[in-house]
């Protein structure tokens, strides 16, 4: 099983995942997930199962906002458990110019270099 080091875990979350979310690159985003990954948003509450469920969630995000940005990351990563977490800011803008700003926390569980489970806690 492939194990990532601390920096690789952080890069997986911030560069391979979030940078592609911000570009709305669906294929690149989904490439970070195992086929049977589970994406949970306890603050909604909602659970998206498998790549198809995760794809549907991102189709809604990408279709609902003209601009998507995630940044100001504060990350922790544990090589032994293959986990990474981040506190970060989110900026979203709709087609009519409405702006949404959030401060979120994500927790990722990584197996063999890809996400197996993700938990997202949103501020609003």
Regions found by a protein language model. Give the residues of each.
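Structural motif
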Residues: 36-38, 83, 107, 114
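Short, surface-exposed coil-to-beta transition loops
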Residues: 69-70, 85-87, 100-106
């Amino acid at each position: 099983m492939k194990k990532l080091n601390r920096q690789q875990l952080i890069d997986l979350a911030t560069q391979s995942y979030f940078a592609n979310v911000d570009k709305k690159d669906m294929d690149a985003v989904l490439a970070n997930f195992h086929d049977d990954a589970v994406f949970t948003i306890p603050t909604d509450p909602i659970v998206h199962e498998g790549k198809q469920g995760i794809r549907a969630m991102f189709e809604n995000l990408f279709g609902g906002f003209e601009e998507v940005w995630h940044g100001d990351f504060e990350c922790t990563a544990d090589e032994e458990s293959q986990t990474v977490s981040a506190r970060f800011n989110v900026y979203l803008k709709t087609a009519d110019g409405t702006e949404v700003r959030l401060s979120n926390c994500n927790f990722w569980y990584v197996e063999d270099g890809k996400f197996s489970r993700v938990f997202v806690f949103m501020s609003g």
